[in-house]
Amino acid sequence: MANIKSAKKRAKQTIVRNERNTGQRSMLRTAVKKVIKALDANDAAGAEAAFAVAQPILDRFSARGLIHKNKAARHKSRLTARIKAIKAA
């Protein structure tokens, strides 16, 4: 454990941030999984609705640095492509 006051404070901040980030990352994964689940069920309307919820979450967390911006772009691109493929079929 840290002995210096500022180091103790930083340790507390790390714990708080870690818990917050873990919860937010879980929320992100859940949102993406809902889109994938709708896609697997060939539910285009449900997938679009779930994607409308997931997209701003991806943008927000990439802006905050919770995930890399390229990872957010990759998720959005792949999910959009799958939604378009289901609508076309």
Curated annotation (Swiss-Prot):
UniProt xrefs under SUPFAM superfamilies: Ribosomal protein S20
Molecular-function GO terms, alphabetical: small ribosomal subunit rRNA binding; structural constituent of ribosome
Region entry Disordered, spans: 1-22
Keywords from the UniProt entry: Ribonucleoprotein, Ribosomal protein, RNA-binding, rRNA-binding
InterPro entries listed in its UniProt record: Ribosomal_bS20, Ribosomal_bS20_sf
A cellular component annotation (GO) from this entry: small ribosomal subunit
Record carries keyword Ribonucleoprotein: yes
Biased composition annotated in UniProt, kind: Basic residues: 1-12
Pfam entry (one): Ribosomal_S20p
GO biological process, one term: translation
Function: Binds directly to 16S ribosomal RNA.
Similarity section: Belongs to the bacterial ribosomal protein bS20 family.
Stored NCBIfam families: S20
Name the UniProt record assigns to this protein: Small ribosomal subunit protein bS20
Recorded name of the encoding gene: rpsT
